[in-house]
Amino acid sequence: MGKFQVLDHPLIQHKLSIIRDKNCGTREFRQCVNEIAELMVYEVSRDMPLEDVEVETPITKATTKRLAGKKVVVVPILRAGIGMVDGILELIPAAKVGHIGMYRDEETLQPHEYFVKMPDDLENREMIIVDPMLATGGSAIMAVDALKKRGAKSIKFVCLVAAPEGVKAFREAHPDVDIYSASLDEYLNEDGYIVPGLGDAGDRLFGTK
């Protein structure tokens, strides 16, 4: 069974508080989302395997540790997920980046996929899907479906805020996938927004309405 983990590090919670504020401007919102993602990847990558590597220091030869095995692919769900990519790449600069494009029907709240672009050999890669919000869970579930259909076997989902309804739906659909969030919020309102949430992350990241 995949785990659901809230990352409650003080720095993450501090920056999350900043972006919850409706008066947080686009520039600061974008910067904090990037920084939160960078802080979160420390925990998300905790179980990545290491291998011994021989290096020569200025003093002598030494056996050191480096990431081994599967190559990482960061997969933002367009468009809001893009805001989390650079923070992860700061710590895993060799990661590849795939993209999944989805939009949500404002009446039914159901997601619709319109674009998927991935590297080859997903079965040999560690996939990290990123999206600031886990609301109904529909987009996240569909994103995992798309990756599994293309052969991915090792998948993690990372978000900033999650609603209990979305977590429940996601875990029922994909019990093998770990979920990491900076917060578990209270509930979804009738418009499908997370409460208290942080509004429309895509609009706030890109200065649109």
From Swiss-Prot:
SUPFAM superfamilies named among the record's database cross-references: PRTase-like
Cofactor: Mg(2+)
Gene3D superfamilies: 3.40.50.2020
EC numbers, comma separated: 2.4.2.9
Pathway: Pyrimidine metabolism; UMP biosynthesis via salvage pathway; UMP from uracil: step 1/1
Molecular function, one GO term: uracil phosphoribosyltransferase activity
Residues at which uracil binds: 194, 199-201
Nucleotide-binding among keywords: yes
Origin superkingdom: Bacteria
Activity regulation (UniProt): Allosterically activated by GTP.
Residue sites binding 5-phospho-alpha-D-ribose 1-diphosphate per the record: 79, 104, 131-139, 200
Signal peptide bounds: none
Cofactor binding note: Binds 1 Mg(2+) ion per subunit. The magnesium is bound as Mg-PRPP.
Function: Catalyzes the conversion of uracil and 5-phospho-alpha-D-ribose 1-diphosphate (PRPP) to UMP and diphosphate.
Family: Belongs to the UPRTase family.
Record-given protein name: Uracil phosphoribosyltransferase
Species of the source: Ligilactobacillus salivarius (strain UCC118) (Lactobacillus salivarius)
